[in-house]
C-alpha cells in the first residue's frame, strides 16, 4: 500500500513538473540591457505566475529575483520583468520559474549588463547581429503553393556567432490577411513567429532590439491610414523589449538606445507615412517631427558611429518600391539636415528589399562618406537584385540569398573601427568591409 502511495505521489509530482515545463509557449528572451537593469521576457500558453532568478556567473551563491507577474490572456500570456539588481559590466545566468517551478532548458540562459567604461578605459569591443524579413510558415493561413519561409537554421548560425545583441530591422514577422483586422490576429501572428523552435536559444542568451516595417505593422505597404495602427504599436511593444518607444510623443515606436560608445536611433517608417499612391499633398515617410527629433538627437550624440535604423533603404537612388527615393523631397530634407548640422559618423541600417547591399554616398571631397547597409532577408524569400539604378551601391556587396550580418566595433576610443561581415544561412562569410570612425569626419 505504501509503495502504491509513493508511486502515486511521484507520478503526481512528475505530472506537475512536466505541466510547468509545458506552460512555456515561447522564450525566455533577453531584451534591453543597461548598466543597472535588464529586461527579461517570457510567454506562457495559459495563465500562470512567472518570475526570474539570476546570479553572477562567477558568484552563483548570491541570487536575485525579479518581481512576480501573472500572465493573462488579454496580453497574450506575455510576461515582461526587470532584473533591477544588476551591477555594471557583469555577466549573469538566469532561471525562469512558472508557478513556482524552475523551467529547464538544454541551452544557455544568460545576459550581460553594460560596462561602466567612460573616464576609465577605452570603450569595449562590441559585436551585434542584424537581419530583417523573417517569415515563419503556417500552412493554414499561407498562400497555396511553395512555402515562402525557409532556412530557419539561420538562427542557429546567428547564435553560434555569439553576438552581444541582435537588431531586428523590420518585417520580423509577416501578418497575414487573417491577422491584420483584429487584435486577436496580431497576438496570434506574433506568438506563432516567436515560438519557432530554432529561434529559442538565440532569444535566451542574446539581447534583442527591434524596429518594424510594413509586414509587422499591418498589410503590405501599409501607411498612416491603417485602421489598427495603435493596436500594431501596442502588440509590437508587448512582444519586444526596447528600452523606450514613441520618444517624439506623436505615436508609433520611435526610440533610442546606447551600447558602449555606440548610439542607435530607431525610426518608425509606418505610423506617419503617406500612402505610396497619394500625390495630393506633402508626402512623407518619417514626417518632419521625427526628422527634427532625429537631427537634434544626432547633434547631441558624440558616438563615433551613429546608427540610424529604419525599415527601408534611404541612400539608394532607385526610385522603386518603398525606397526613400520614391519620397524624394523628404529624403533630400533628411540628408541635407544631416550635412547642414555637420553630423559625423552616420550609418543607416535597414532591410525590406530581400537582398543585401552596402551603399556609399560621398557628394564631394569636402564631405565624408555616409553608408547605408541593407540586410535582407533572414528566412523570407531572397532574390538576386543588381540594384541597377542605385548609383551608390558597392557592387561586390550584393547578396541574393538568405543572410544576416554581424557588425563588430573595435579599437581605442579615438580610433574605432567598424567591421561589417555578411554570412549565409550556414554561417559562412560572404563578404566583409572595414570602416574607420576617423574616415567619417569633416
Feature names for model-found ranges:
Residues 1-23:
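Bacterial Sec-dependent N-terminal signal peptides
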Residues 21-442:
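Metal-dependent phosphoester/phosphodiester hydrolase catalytic core
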Amino acid at each position: 500500500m505504501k509503495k502504491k502511495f509513493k508511486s502515486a505521489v511521484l507520478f503526481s509530482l512528475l505530472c506537475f513538473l512536466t505541466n510547468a515545463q509545458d506552460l512555456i509557449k515561447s522564450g525566455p528572451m533577453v531584451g534591453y540591457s543597461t548598466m543597472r537593469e535588464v529586461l527579461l521576457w517570457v510567454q506562457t500558453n495559459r495563465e500562470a505566475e512567472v518570475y526570474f532568478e539570476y546570479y553572477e556567473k562567477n558568484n552563483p551563491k548570491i541570487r536575485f529575483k525579479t518581481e512576480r507577474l501573472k500572465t493573462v490572456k488579454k496580453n497574450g500570456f506575455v510576461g515582461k520583468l526587470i532584473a533591477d539588481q544588476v551591477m555594471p559590466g557583469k555577466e549573469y545566468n538566469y532561471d525562469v520559474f512558472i508557478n513556482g517551478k524552475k523551467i529547464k532548458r538544454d541551452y544557455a540562459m544568460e545576459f550581460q549588463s553594460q560596462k561602466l567604461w567612460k573616464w576609465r578605459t577605452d570603450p569595449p569591443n562590441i559585436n551585434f547581429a542584424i537581419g530583417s524579413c523573417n517569415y515563419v510558415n503556417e500552412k493554414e493561413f499561407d498562400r497555396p503553393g511553395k512555402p515562402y519561409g525557409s532556412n530557419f537554421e539561420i538562427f542557429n548560425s546567428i547564435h553560434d556567432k555569439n553576438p552581444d545583441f541582435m537588431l531586428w530591422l523590420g518585417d520580423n514577422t509577416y501578418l497575414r490577411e487573417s491577422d491584420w483586422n483584429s487584435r486577436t490576429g496580431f497576438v496570434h501572428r506574433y506568438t506563432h513567429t516567436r515560438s519557432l523552435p530554432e529561434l529559442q536559444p538565440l532569444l535566451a542568451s542574446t539581447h534583442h532590439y527591434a524596429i518594424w516595417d510594413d509586414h509587422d505593422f499591418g498589410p503590405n505597404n501599409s501607411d498612416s491610414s491603417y485602421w489598427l495602427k495603435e493596436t500594431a504599436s501596442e502588440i509590437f511593444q508587448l512582444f519586444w523589449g526596447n528600452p523606450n518607444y514613441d520618444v517624439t510623443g506623436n505615436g508609433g515606436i520611435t526610440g533610442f538606445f546606447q551600447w558602449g560608445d555606440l548610439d542607435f536611433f530607431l525610426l518608425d517608417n509606418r505610423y506617419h507615412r503617406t500612402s505610396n499612391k497619394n500625390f495630393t499633398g506633402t508626402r512623407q515617410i518619417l514626417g518632419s517631427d521625427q526628422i527634427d527629433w532625429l537631427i537634434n538627437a544626432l547633434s547631441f550624440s558624440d558616438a563615433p558611429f551613429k546608427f540610424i535604423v529604419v525599415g527601408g533603404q534611404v541612400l539608394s537612388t532607385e526610385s522603386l518600391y518603398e525606397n526613400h527615393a520614391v519620397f524624394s523631397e523628404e529624403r533630400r530634407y533628411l540628408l541635407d539636415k544631416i550635412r547642414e548640422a555637420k553630423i559625423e559618423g552616420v550609418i543607416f541600417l535597414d532591410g525590406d528589399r530581400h537582398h543585401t547591399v552596402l551603399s556609399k554616398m560621398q557628394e564631394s571631397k569636402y564631405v565624408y562618406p555616409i553608408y547605408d547597409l541593407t540586410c535582407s532577408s533572414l528566412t523570407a524569400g531572397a532574390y538576386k537584385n543588381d540594384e541597377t539604378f542605385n548609383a551608390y551601391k558597392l557592387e561586390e556587396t550584393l547578396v541574393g540569398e538568405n543572410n544576416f550580418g554581424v557588425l563588430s566595433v573595435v579599437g581605442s576610443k579615438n580610433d574605432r573601427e567598424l567591421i561589417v561581415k555578411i554570412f549565409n544561412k550556414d554561417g559562412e562569410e560572404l563578404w566583409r568591409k572595414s570602416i574607420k570612425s576617423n574616415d567619417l569626419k569633416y
